[in-house]
Amino acid sequence: MSSAYLYSILATAAIFTLLALSLNIITGYAGQAMMGIAAFFGLGAYTAAIITTNGGNFLLALVAGMLVSGVFGAILGVISLRLQADFLAITTIGINFVMVAVFNRLKITGGTLGLTIKKPVLFGLKMNNMYFFYMTVVLIVILCLLLVKMRRSWFGMALASINNDPGAARSFGINVNRYQILAFTIGTAVAGLAGGMYAHRMGFISSSDFAFVVSIQIVSMVVIGGLGTIRGPIFGALLISSLPELLRFADDYRELVYGLLLVLMVRFMPEGLIGDDSPVWGALTKLWRRFVPKKKTRADLIAESAEGGR
Protein backbone atom coordinates (compact mmCIF):
# COMPACT_ATOMS: atom_id res chain seq x y z
CA MET A 1 0.00 0.00 0.00
CA SER A 2 1.52 3.32 -1.08
CA SER A 3 1.76 6.24 1.35
CA ALA A 4 -0.49 8.35 -0.92
CA TYR A 5 -3.24 5.72 -0.80
CA LEU A 6 -2.81 5.29 2.96
CA TYR A 7 -3.20 9.03 3.54
CA SER A 8 -6.26 8.98 1.28
CA ILE A 9 -7.90 6.42 3.59
CA LEU A 10 -6.74 8.22 6.74
CA ALA A 11 -7.98 11.62 5.53
CA THR A 12 -11.43 10.21 4.76
CA ALA A 13 -11.56 8.40 8.11
CA ALA A 14 -10.61 11.61 9.93
CA ILE A 15 -13.33 13.61 8.16
CA PHE A 16 -15.94 11.00 9.03
CA THR A 17 -14.69 11.04 12.63
CA LEU A 18 -15.39 14.78 12.71
CA LEU A 19 -18.84 14.10 11.24
CA ALA A 20 -19.58 11.35 13.80
CA LEU A 21 -18.63 13.72 16.63
CA SER A 22 -21.04 16.30 15.21
CA LEU A 23 -23.93 13.83 15.29
CA ASN A 24 -22.98 12.81 18.82
CA ILE A 25 -23.55 16.38 20.02
CA ILE A 26 -27.16 16.22 18.82
CA THR A 27 -28.03 12.59 19.55
CA GLY A 28 -25.55 11.52 22.19
CA TYR A 29 -25.59 14.63 24.38
CA ALA A 30 -28.98 16.24 23.68
CA GLY A 31 -30.83 12.97 23.01
CA GLN A 32 -32.41 14.18 19.75
CA ALA A 33 -33.21 11.60 17.07
CA MET A 34 -31.21 12.95 14.11
CA MET A 35 -31.30 10.60 11.12
CA GLY A 36 -30.38 13.06 8.37
CA ILE A 37 -26.95 14.41 9.30
CA ALA A 38 -25.74 13.87 5.71
CA ALA A 39 -28.00 16.75 4.58
CA PHE A 40 -26.00 19.22 6.69
CA PHE A 41 -22.76 17.52 5.69
CA GLY A 42 -23.80 18.27 2.10
CA LEU A 43 -24.81 21.87 2.86
CA GLY A 44 -21.36 22.60 4.24
CA ALA A 45 -19.68 20.79 1.35
CA TYR A 46 -21.56 22.61 -1.40
CA THR A 47 -21.33 26.01 0.32
CA ALA A 48 -17.56 25.77 0.75
CA ALA A 49 -17.06 24.31 -2.74
CA ILE A 50 -19.12 27.02 -4.46
CA ILE A 51 -17.14 29.74 -2.68
CA THR A 52 -13.70 28.37 -3.58
CA THR A 53 -14.65 27.56 -7.18
CA ASN A 54 -15.56 31.23 -7.51
CA GLY A 55 -12.17 32.36 -6.22
CA GLY A 56 -12.95 32.51 -2.49
CA ASN A 57 -10.52 31.79 0.34
CA PHE A 58 -10.43 28.18 1.53
CA LEU A 59 -10.58 28.92 5.27
CA LEU A 60 -13.36 31.47 4.83
CA ALA A 61 -15.23 28.92 2.72
CA LEU A 62 -15.03 26.40 5.59
CA VAL A 63 -16.40 29.00 8.00
CA ALA A 64 -19.20 29.85 5.56
CA GLY A 65 -20.07 26.16 5.27
CA MET A 66 -20.30 25.95 9.06
CA LEU A 67 -22.53 29.02 9.23
CA VAL A 68 -24.95 27.87 6.53
CA SER A 69 -25.27 24.39 8.04
CA GLY A 70 -25.61 25.85 11.52
CA VAL A 71 -28.40 28.23 10.48
CA PHE A 72 -30.37 25.42 8.84
CA GLY A 73 -29.65 23.28 11.89
CA ALA A 74 -31.08 25.98 14.16
CA ILE A 75 -34.25 26.01 12.03
CA LEU A 76 -34.48 22.23 12.39
CA GLY A 77 -33.93 22.67 16.13
CA VAL A 78 -36.97 24.95 16.30
CA ILE A 79 -39.01 22.42 14.32
CA SER A 80 -37.87 19.62 16.65
CA LEU A 81 -39.51 21.33 19.62
CA ARG A 82 -42.93 20.36 18.25
CA LEU A 83 -42.03 16.76 17.40
CA GLN A 84 -41.70 13.58 19.42
CA ALA A 85 -38.59 11.44 18.94
CA ASP A 86 -40.10 9.07 16.36
CA PHE A 87 -41.56 11.89 14.27
CA LEU A 88 -38.32 13.86 14.53
CA ALA A 89 -36.38 10.89 13.17
CA ILE A 90 -38.81 10.57 10.24
CA THR A 91 -38.66 14.34 9.63
CA THR A 92 -34.86 14.37 9.48
CA ILE A 93 -34.92 11.42 7.07
CA GLY A 94 -37.30 13.41 4.87
CA ILE A 95 -35.04 16.46 5.06
CA ASN A 96 -32.13 14.33 3.88
CA PHE A 97 -34.06 13.17 0.80
CA VAL A 98 -35.30 16.71 0.08
CA MET A 99 -31.77 18.17 0.27
CA VAL A 100 -30.43 15.52 -2.11
CA ALA A 101 -33.22 16.41 -4.56
CA VAL A 102 -32.35 20.12 -4.21
CA PHE A 103 -28.65 19.42 -4.85
CA ASN A 104 -29.68 17.53 -7.99
CA ARG A 105 -31.87 20.37 -9.28
CA LEU A 106 -29.77 23.47 -8.69
CA LYS A 107 -27.46 24.69 -11.42
CA ILE A 108 -25.03 26.21 -8.91
CA THR A 109 -24.40 22.77 -7.37
CA GLY A 110 -23.74 21.19 -10.75
CA GLY A 111 -27.03 19.30 -10.71
CA THR A 112 -26.79 15.59 -11.42
CA LEU A 113 -23.34 16.10 -12.98
CA GLY A 114 -21.82 17.19 -9.68
CA LEU A 115 -19.25 19.85 -8.90
CA THR A 116 -15.50 19.78 -9.52
CA ILE A 117 -13.33 21.58 -6.96
CA LYS A 118 -9.69 22.56 -7.32
CA LYS A 119 -7.32 21.53 -4.55
CA PRO A 120 -6.94 24.57 -2.27
CA VAL A 121 -3.67 26.26 -1.37
CA LEU A 122 -3.15 26.97 2.32
CA PHE A 123 -0.19 29.03 3.57
CA GLY A 124 1.58 28.44 0.26
CA LEU A 125 1.05 24.66 0.35
CA LYS A 126 -1.15 22.87 -2.16
CA MET A 127 -3.36 20.65 -0.03
CA ASN A 128 -2.99 16.92 -0.61
CA ASN A 129 -4.32 13.93 1.34
CA MET A 130 -1.53 14.10 3.90
CA TYR A 131 -2.21 17.78 4.67
CA PHE A 132 -5.96 17.16 4.78
CA PHE A 133 -5.41 14.32 7.24
CA TYR A 134 -3.24 16.35 9.60
CA MET A 135 -5.49 19.40 9.35
CA THR A 136 -8.56 17.30 10.15
CA VAL A 137 -6.78 15.65 13.09
CA VAL A 138 -6.02 19.12 14.48
CA LEU A 139 -9.71 20.04 14.09
CA ILE A 140 -10.72 16.80 15.87
CA VAL A 141 -8.35 17.49 18.77
CA ILE A 142 -9.67 21.06 19.13
CA LEU A 143 -13.27 19.81 19.00
CA CYS A 144 -12.57 17.08 21.58
CA LEU A 145 -10.99 19.60 23.97
CA LEU A 146 -14.02 21.86 23.56
CA LEU A 147 -16.37 18.92 24.14
CA VAL A 148 -14.53 17.94 27.34
CA LYS A 149 -14.85 21.51 28.57
CA MET A 150 -18.49 21.64 27.46
CA ARG A 151 -19.43 18.45 29.33
CA ARG A 152 -18.05 19.93 32.56
CA SER A 153 -19.86 23.22 32.04
CA TRP A 154 -23.41 24.20 32.91
CA PHE A 155 -24.33 23.75 29.24
CA GLY A 156 -23.10 20.14 29.27
CA MET A 157 -24.85 19.34 32.54
CA ALA A 158 -28.06 20.87 31.19
CA LEU A 159 -27.86 18.71 28.05
CA ALA A 160 -27.26 15.60 30.19
CA SER A 161 -30.31 16.46 32.28
CA ILE A 162 -32.44 17.02 29.16
CA ASN A 163 -31.22 13.72 27.69
CA ASN A 164 -32.18 11.82 30.85
CA ASP A 165 -35.56 13.47 31.48
CA PRO A 166 -36.70 16.68 29.72
CA GLY A 167 -39.62 17.06 32.13
CA ALA A 168 -37.37 16.90 35.18
CA ALA A 169 -34.95 19.32 33.51
CA ARG A 170 -37.77 21.84 33.07
CA SER A 171 -38.74 21.49 36.72
CA PHE A 172 -35.20 22.51 37.67
CA GLY A 173 -35.56 25.69 35.61
CA ILE A 174 -33.54 24.56 32.59
CA ASN A 175 -34.66 26.15 29.32
CA VAL A 176 -35.00 22.87 27.41
CA ASN A 177 -36.02 24.51 24.13
CA ARG A 178 -33.00 26.81 24.04
CA TYR A 179 -30.51 24.05 24.80
CA GLN A 180 -31.99 21.70 22.21
CA ILE A 181 -31.77 24.40 19.54
CA LEU A 182 -28.17 25.14 20.57
CA ALA A 183 -27.28 21.45 20.31
CA PHE A 184 -28.74 21.26 16.80
CA THR A 185 -26.93 24.45 15.79
CA ILE A 186 -23.53 23.38 17.10
CA GLY A 187 -23.80 19.81 15.81
CA THR A 188 -24.90 20.78 12.30
CA ALA A 189 -22.25 23.53 12.13
CA VAL A 190 -19.54 20.93 12.84
CA ALA A 191 -21.13 18.69 10.19
CA GLY A 192 -20.85 21.62 7.77
CA LEU A 193 -17.16 21.96 8.61
CA ALA A 194 -16.66 18.26 7.91
CA GLY A 195 -18.50 18.74 4.61
CA GLY A 196 -16.21 21.57 3.55
CA MET A 197 -13.16 19.44 4.30
CA TYR A 198 -14.66 16.49 2.44
CA ALA A 199 -15.48 18.48 -0.71
CA HIS A 200 -11.95 19.86 -1.04
CA ARG A 201 -10.26 16.60 -0.12
CA MET A 202 -12.27 14.70 -2.77
CA GLY A 203 -12.03 17.36 -5.49
CA PHE A 204 -15.47 16.37 -6.76
CA ILE A 205 -18.87 16.04 -5.10
CA SER A 206 -22.32 15.01 -6.23
CA SER A 207 -25.63 14.54 -4.44
CA SER A 208 -24.97 10.82 -3.95
CA ASP A 209 -22.17 11.71 -1.52
CA PHE A 210 -24.84 13.00 0.88
CA ALA A 211 -27.56 10.40 0.38
CA PHE A 212 -29.53 8.89 3.26
CA VAL A 213 -27.26 5.84 3.28
CA VAL A 214 -24.44 8.15 4.41
CA SER A 215 -26.58 9.27 7.36
CA ILE A 216 -27.11 5.61 8.30
CA GLN A 217 -23.36 5.08 8.07
CA ILE A 218 -22.70 7.97 10.48
CA VAL A 219 -25.43 6.80 12.88
CA SER A 220 -23.78 3.36 12.82
CA MET A 221 -20.44 4.91 13.76
CA VAL A 222 -21.89 6.70 16.79
CA VAL A 223 -24.09 3.83 18.01
CA ILE A 224 -21.45 1.13 17.54
CA GLY A 225 -18.79 3.20 19.30
CA GLY A 226 -20.96 4.48 22.14
CA LEU A 227 -23.44 7.35 22.32
CA GLY A 228 -22.73 10.27 24.61
CA THR A 229 -18.97 9.71 24.81
CA ILE A 230 -16.08 11.26 22.92
CA ARG A 231 -14.12 8.05 22.44
CA GLY A 232 -17.16 6.14 21.08
CA PRO A 233 -17.76 8.08 17.85
CA ILE A 234 -14.01 8.22 17.20
CA PHE A 235 -13.67 4.45 17.57
CA GLY A 236 -16.86 3.81 15.58
CA ALA A 237 -15.76 6.12 12.76
CA LEU A 238 -12.36 4.45 12.49
CA LEU A 239 -13.96 0.99 12.54
CA ILE A 240 -16.66 1.72 9.94
CA SER A 241 -14.25 3.71 7.74
CA SER A 242 -11.94 0.70 7.58
CA LEU A 243 -14.73 -1.68 6.52
CA PRO A 244 -14.60 -0.78 2.78
CA GLU A 245 -11.00 -2.02 2.74
CA LEU A 246 -11.88 -5.12 4.75
CA LEU A 247 -15.01 -5.85 2.70
CA ARG A 248 -13.67 -5.35 -0.81
CA PHE A 249 -14.74 -8.88 -1.65
CA ALA A 250 -18.35 -7.98 -0.76
CA ASP A 251 -18.58 -4.42 -2.04
CA ASP A 252 -22.20 -4.81 -3.18
CA TYR A 253 -23.27 -5.75 0.33
CA ARG A 254 -21.46 -2.99 2.23
CA GLU A 255 -24.65 -1.11 3.18
CA LEU A 256 -26.20 -4.39 4.31
CA VAL A 257 -23.25 -4.94 6.65
CA TYR A 258 -23.64 -1.41 8.10
CA GLY A 259 -27.34 -2.01 8.71
CA LEU A 260 -26.75 -5.45 10.22
CA LEU A 261 -24.08 -4.10 12.58
CA LEU A 262 -26.41 -1.28 13.64
CA VAL A 263 -29.33 -3.66 14.33
CA LEU A 264 -27.12 -6.08 16.29
CA MET A 265 -25.64 -3.29 18.41
CA VAL A 266 -29.04 -1.77 19.21
CA ARG A 267 -30.41 -5.22 20.08
CA PHE A 268 -27.56 -6.72 22.09
CA MET A 269 -25.30 -3.83 23.13
CA PRO A 270 -27.21 -0.50 22.98
CA GLU A 271 -24.52 1.23 25.03
CA GLY A 272 -21.99 0.63 22.21
CA LEU A 273 -18.70 -1.22 22.18
CA ILE A 274 -16.89 1.30 24.36
CA GLY A 275 -19.75 3.32 25.83
CA ASP A 276 -19.78 4.23 29.51
CA ASP A 277 -21.93 1.21 30.49
CA SER A 278 -20.40 -1.20 28.00
CA PRO A 279 -19.03 -4.48 29.44
CA VAL A 280 -16.18 -4.22 26.94
CA TRP A 281 -15.24 -0.77 28.24
CA GLY A 282 -15.64 -2.00 31.83
CA ALA A 283 -13.24 -4.88 31.16
CA LEU A 284 -10.73 -2.57 29.46
CA THR A 285 -10.91 -0.13 32.38
CA LYS A 286 -10.27 -2.92 34.91
CA LEU A 287 -7.35 -4.19 32.84
CA TRP A 288 -5.89 -0.67 32.68
CA ARG A 289 -6.17 -0.23 36.44
CA ARG A 290 -4.50 -3.57 37.04
CA PHE A 291 -1.42 -2.79 34.95
CA VAL A 292 -1.29 0.99 35.43
CA PRO A 293 -1.69 1.75 39.15
CA LYS A 294 -3.46 4.94 40.07
CA LYS A 295 -1.16 7.79 41.04
CA LYS A 296 -1.44 8.64 44.70
CA THR A 297 -2.79 12.08 45.49
CA ARG A 298 -1.56 14.31 48.28
CA ALA A 299 -4.61 13.35 50.35
CA ASP A 300 -3.75 9.64 49.94
CA LEU A 301 -0.17 10.24 51.11
CA ILE A 302 -1.35 12.20 54.16
CA ALA A 303 -3.81 9.43 55.04
CA GLU A 304 -1.10 6.77 54.70
CA SER A 305 1.36 8.72 56.86
CA ALA A 306 -1.34 9.23 59.50
CA GLU A 307 -2.06 5.50 59.58
CA GLY A 308 1.63 4.68 59.75
CA GLY A 309 2.07 6.94 62.75
CA ARG A 310 -0.56 5.08 64.79
Give, region by region, the residue ranges found by the protein language model:
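Transmembrane alpha-helices and adjacent helix-loop boundaries
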Residues: 1-310
